[in-house]
Amino acid sequence: MNRHTDIAARLINHNPSAYGTRTFDEDIDFKSAPEESRELIASADLIHCHHWIDLASNPFGVDLRKKHVLRHFHSEPHFVAKHANVAVADIVGDERPQLVVAQFQERYYPRAKPVPNLLDLEALDRIAADTPRMARPTATVRLAYAPTTDVSAFSERWNTKGAPETLRILERMRERLPLTIDVFHALPHAEAMRRKFAADIVIDELVTGSYHLSGLESMAMGLTTLGYLDARTTAVVAALTGSMSLPWINVPLHAAPECLETLIDSSELRTFAGAAGMHWIRNNWDTQKLIRHYVEAYDDVLNGRPLVRSSRVNELNDIAIPDYNWRTNIKQLERCLNEG
């Protein structure tokens, strides 16, 4: 925000250790600088709150009821409600202006404006420049996979990345193909990026129908990246970027083995796919372009204008049918696993 706009922004994190060893760059740690944090909150024109906090009684010890507040959701409402001990209806129906990450979550927040997860392309370029990458046109292909949870694809609709099932399929493939699998989690962000950049292929997530920041970062570094976006998520990406194409190799998990085998057999195809994905990201997910979604939202909130969605949610087309297709994919995945 500070680099690309004239907005003076500070990021206050109440608990930087919330993800354990999976750490990120920080600005202000509230627990280390509570008074500075409260002074910044008091002087701010706008408070951009991530996740849900009570405006009157919250861990920051400040009353936000008279401030311009913009809520920003990163999880589906039931997950937020469970951890905040608040009713789903209170979250979804809250009259304060709302943003929601432009992934699967947006279909459940009809009042929220979808916004992109922005990339620090300069930081990714520095990591790429500092990380040796060996060309392996005929040797073993290296695949990186970094799930943040080990929840099964069969037990949750959204709170999963299908890690157990994905790993079962990859292990089978490794037994008969020139494939090395680098699986990692709970690493500092910069280290995770270096591990990915050393790979030929990256798997984002292939079971829910959504994409994640991990896949965007991989494609920004020119890596061949597999993901699976359902029809609603695809439409949201199109509305956000204006592009009708996708940079992911878009494939559900049950169909991934054939796709991966083709990629493993062809270094030329991997190079082409990686370059195409990188070109798409640099042209359509450029931070300088996409940051306008935030700037416009801030301007609307400060001037008392409602936030406008560019893509309305239809219960049948955007929720019921994608859920039906997901159930079909899960059944096909079960058959795929049983055939092995």
Regions found by a protein language model. Name each.
Residues I12-D94, V100-F104:
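Extended catalytic core of nucleotide-activated donor transferases of GT-like folds
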Residues G93-T138:
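Donor nucleotide-sugar binding/catalytic pocket of nucleotide-sugar-dependent glycosyltransferases
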Residues L119-L187:
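Conserved catalytic-core segment of nucleotide-activated headgroup transferases in glycan assembly
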Residues F197-A199, E217-T224:
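Conserved donor-binding/catalytic loop of nucleotide-activated donor transferases
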Residues L206-V207:
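Aromatic "clamp/platform" in nucleotide-sugar-dependent glycosyltransferases that forms part
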Residues T224-T233:
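Short hydrophobic beta-strand element within catalytic cores of glycosyltransferases
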Residues E268-D299, N303-R305, I319-I321:
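A charged, aromatic-enriched C-terminal amphipathic alpha-helix characteristic of glycosyltransferases
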